[in-house]
Each structure stands twice: as C-alpha cells, then as structure tokens.
C-alpha cells in the first residue's frame, strides 16, 4: 500500500506543477486590480531633493537646457490637426503594410491578416523643446524632443486554421530626441530637397500587447526582452550617424546639377570648307560648347585664308549630365567687319562616348541642327575631325584620399599628376561696409591670373551671392592659394567708383587633402566683415 501511495504522490506532483503554472499564468495576465489609489498631490517646493532628482527626466528640456526653445504654438497646432493626421497616417499605414501581410498568407497555416481597428487614439504627441543649429551647409538643422504617451486602438486579427486570434496594441509610449535636417535648401517650393531624420539616443519604447484578451507583456522577463530588442533594432537603423532619408523633390529638379566629369576635346583639322571671302577663301575658326551650359563657348584660333586648316588645339569642358548633354561644334568664317558667317555645324551626344575611352569623329558639316530644314540643303560644307575623351570624376572619401597619398611614393606622384576641377562657391558675406553710407558689394575670385566676378548687389551690408566658379587644372593646386576680394562699386558719378571692402587668401592644401572645405573667413582690412566660401577639388 505504501508503494502505491508513493507512486500516486509522484504522479500528482508531476501533473500538478504544469497545471499550477498554467493557472498562475492566466491569473497573472487576466487579473485586474479592483481598486486603484492615486498618490496625493503636493506642491513642488515641498518635495525633497531626492524626489526632484527622480522627476528630472520628466521635466521639459526647455527648462533644463537654455539651448532648447518652447514650441507651445506647435503643440497646439498638432492638437487641432490630430484627428485629421490620425486618419491620414493610418491610411498610409494600411496601404504600406498590406503587401507585407500578403507575403505571410499561406505560411505557418495563416489564412488571413487584417486590421480590425486602426487608430492612433485621441492623445497627440508633444514636443517638449526644439534646439536649432547654425551650420555652413545649405540646410536647416534642428532637434525636437518628442514624447508620446498615446491611447491607440490597434487590433490585428490573424486567422489560423479557421481560428481568429486577436492581437491588440495598447498603452503605447515613445520618447526620443530626433535630429531633422531639411536639405539642400533650394529656390523651388517647398524649398528643400529631402528630409533626413536620425535618433540622437536610444528611444524609450513601452507598450502593452494583448493576445486573446490577455496581456502578453505581463509574462516575467518577456517585457524587458522585447523592449531591449526594439531599442536595439531601431537604434541600429536610425541612431546617428545612421539616417532615414525621405525625398521630397525629384532629383532632376531638386538642385543644380554638379559637375560629374571633364570632356577632353581636341579640334584636329577641317577639310574642304566653304568659300566665303571674295578671293575664294575663308578665315575659319571653331566654336565649341555643351548644351545646357550658360558659360561662354570656347574658340580655336583663326586660320587665315585656309579651306583645309590644321588646329590640333585641346579644350576641357565641364560635364554635368553625360546622358543628356550634347557637344555642339560650329565652324565660322571670321570677318573684320560685320557678323561672322557660319560655314557649318555638327552635334555629338555624349552618350556615344564611353567613360575613359578616346574616340575620333570625322564629321560631315551641316547647315543647322534642324533635320527637316537641313534635308533640302545639298551643298557640301566640308568635314571636321575631332578627338573626344570623357573622364568622369572620382568620388573619394577623406580617408581614401589620405591613404592613397601615404601608401607609396609612386602613387603619390600619380596623385600629384591628376587633372581635376576646382570649384569655388562664393555663398555670402556679412557686415561688409565701406567709407560710403551704402555699399554695392560684389566678390572677385583671383586664381592663376584668372579673374571671375559675382553679380553686384545694391545697398546691402549682408550680400548673398550663391555663385559658383570652376577652374579646370592639369594638376592639383598644391602649395597654392586663391584670393577672394569683396569690392563695392558706385552707381552715380564718382571719381572713385570702386572700393575694396576686404579680402581673404585661402591656402588650397586642405582642399586637395580633404576634397572640400566649407568655412567662414574674417576679411582682411575689414572691421567686422565675414565671407562664406565653399571650395571643392574633384579629380578625374
């Protein structure tokens, strides 16, 4: 009898433990307190220092940090707009996740996934302070502190083996400091090309998850595991320097196209050109340009009294879009008096040239680029021989530039022999003043004997030019400098119409090493004048 009693006791123990655990689990997740007591409220001045330290994380940033500003007006705006924002955001969520749900249907015996309810609740997020940054870039940079303790009603229904499983998200909390950059700033509405978002610290995420009516987050250990996993995953994707880029404007219209390469053009020779002069000869020269450029066309020398000229002259043209730009070649007869007669022309799309490949063209000259009008012209206008090579720029990081210069001396020699493009962007100036009451400032860029000017702005001490100039170079400008002068020009009848408001000499070694500098400089011979200049060096 004692043996059977021992066996039954062991069986009862083995069966009782799982049953007890299951019953305890359901009692834990379904039990709700019947009576809740709220703590007494006391004035803040009556609290101790330890209590204040506990409350410190909940105090708005504009109270703790003077760099953060209050944005009550923005919170009111969000509050009034929240019912409409709720529906708009939920509509975007529905359309975005439907394809994801479709991928899971048929796997793990899932027959359907759909939202039974989808609402972000009645409590909008609030911004507890905003910090703005001043940068030298064309961007608007700010950091809002966002807190959202919402009451969303999000119910997802999964149908598995004809069984409906309801999953409900409740009591969502999300606290984060977000860095937002609107860039680049543009003259096209809405005046910025994209929104770049990143998190400055790990976000605080808290929520309840009910499955079949029970709170799954009440299971010991599961809540902390899920919370840490979400923080880790979100931080790995969006914690600075990782960013989320949201394009606003199309790339074709978002910004001014930057140079992407150099087109090396060799004008070799021409044959059997038209006779335009009275003596049966011509004085030909070639004008060459790229479509879509506002820069003046480049010209060869004039070959006097020659219908079969030999030039062998070389030019470099800046390419911004090799897929759409076209090289336009025009042959003119030079005349001392009156306009120059066009002997013929031809056009070469850059798409016909592979990057890095040298290609020679022997072109039949035509009257004009209009195919319909030119088809009726049977006159032979001669031939033009040119040699083309398109060399795209290389995008290199600072680290790669420095490593390439430190690895070998031979590689260093190759680096110093690379041709490239020096771009100088004169952005703006501040507090430039001369002897006269009103200044009409403009900037002059001086480099290797070349002089380039910005437009003149009338009656201002804080001009904004935003103009860029390019210099094509055969080698990097090592141990060289560039001078930028700010001048003022009188608009009336003055004996001394020009006046220098200040200047700056910029060493280009840092530009060659780093590829780019973007700084503000104090003007020499100016009391408080500052000029903002960006310089880029791009190798081909």
From Swiss-Prot:
Its cofactor is Ca(2+). GO terms for biological process: lipid transport. Residues 67-249 form the SMP-LTD domain. Residues 227-509 are annotated as: Phospholipid binding. Its main location: membrane. Ca(2+) 1 binds at residues 277, 283, 333, 335. InterPro entries: C2_dom, C2_domain_sf, SMP_LBD, Synaptotagmin_plant, Synaptotagmin_SMP. Ca(2+) 2 binds at residues 277, 333, 335, 341. SMART domains: C2. The chain crosses the membrane at residues 9-29. Pfam families: C2, SMP_LBD. It is found in: Membrane. It is a single-pass membrane protein. One of its GO terms (molecular function) is lipid binding. One of its GO terms (cellular component) is endomembrane system. Residues 240-363, 401-521 form the C2 domain. It comes from the Eukaryota. Keywords: Calcium, Lipid transport, Lipid-binding, Membrane, Metal-binding, Repeat, Transmembrane, Transmembrane helix, Transport. Belongs to the synaptotagmin family. PANTHER family: EXTENDED SYNAPTOTAGMIN-RELATED, SYNAPTOTAGMIN-3. May be involved in membrane trafficking. This is Synaptotagmin-3.
């Amino acid at each position: 009898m004692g043996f059977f009693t021992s066996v039954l006791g062991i069986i009862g123990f083995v069966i009782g433990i799982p049953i007890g655990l299951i019953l305890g689990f359901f009692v834990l997740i379904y039990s709700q307190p019947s009576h809740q007591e709220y703590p007494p409220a006391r004035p803040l001045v009556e609290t101790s220092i330890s209590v204040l330290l506990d409350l410190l994380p909940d105090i708005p940033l504009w109270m703790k940090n003077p760099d953060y500003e209050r944005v009550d007006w923005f919170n009111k705006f969000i509050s009034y707009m929240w019912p409409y924002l709720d529906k708009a955001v939920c509509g975007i969520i529905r359309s975005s996740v439907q394809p994801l749900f479709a991928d899971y249907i048929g796997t793990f015996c899932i027959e359907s996934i759909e939202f039974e309810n989808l609402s972000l609740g009645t409590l909008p997020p609030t911004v507890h302070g905003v910090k703005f940054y001043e940068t030298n870039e064309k961007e608007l940079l700010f950091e809002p502190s966002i807190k959202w303790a919402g009451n969303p009603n999000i119910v997802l229904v999964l149908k598995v083996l004809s069984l409906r499983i309801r999953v409900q998200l409740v009591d969502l909390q999300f606290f984060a400091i977000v860095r937002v950059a609107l860039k680049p700033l543009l003259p096209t509405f809405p005046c910025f090309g994209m929104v770049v978002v990143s998190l400055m610290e790990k976000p605080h995420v808290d929520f309840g998850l009910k499955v079949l009516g029970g709170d799954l987050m009440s299971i010991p250990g599961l809540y902390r595991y899920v919370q840490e996993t979400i923080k880790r995953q979100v931080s790995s994707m969006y914690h600075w320097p990782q960013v989320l880029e949201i394009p606003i404007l199309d790339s074709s219209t978002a910004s001014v196209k930057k140079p992407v390469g150099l087109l090396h053009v060799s004008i070799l020779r021409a044959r059997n050109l038209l006779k335009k002069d009275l003596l049966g000869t011509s004085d030909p020269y070639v004008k060459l340009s790229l479509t879509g450029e506002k820069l003046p066309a480049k010209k060869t020398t004039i070959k006097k009294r020659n219908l079969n000229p030999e030039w062998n002259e070389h030019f470099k043209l800046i390419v911004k879009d090799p897929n759409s730009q076209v090289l336009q070649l025009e042959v003119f007869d030079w005349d001392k008096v009156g306009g120059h007669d066009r002997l013929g022309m031809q056009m070469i799309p850059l798409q016909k040239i592979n990057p890095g490949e040298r290609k020679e063209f022997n072109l039949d000259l035509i009257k004009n680029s209009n195919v319909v009008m030119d088809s009726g012209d049977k006159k032979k206008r001669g031939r033009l021989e040119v040699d083309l090579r398109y060399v795209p720029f290389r995008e290199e990081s600072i680290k790669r530039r420095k490593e390439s210069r430190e690895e070998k001396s031979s590689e260093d020699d190759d680096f110093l022999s690379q041709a490239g493009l020096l771009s100088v962007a004169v952005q703006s100036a501040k507090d430039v003043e001369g002897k006269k009451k009103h200044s009409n400032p403009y900037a002059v860029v001086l480099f290797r004997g070349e002089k380039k000017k910005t437009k003149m702005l009338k009656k201002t001490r804080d001009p904004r030019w935003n103009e860029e100039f390019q210099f094509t170079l055969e080698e990097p400008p090592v141990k060289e400098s560039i001078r930028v002068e700010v001048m003022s020009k009188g608009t009336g009848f003055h004996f001394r119409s020009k006046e220098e408001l200040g200047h700056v000499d910029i060493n280009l070694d840092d530009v060659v090493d780093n590829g780019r500098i973007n700084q503000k400089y104090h003007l020499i011979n100016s009391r408080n004048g500052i000029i903002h200049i960006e310089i880029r060096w791009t190798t081909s």
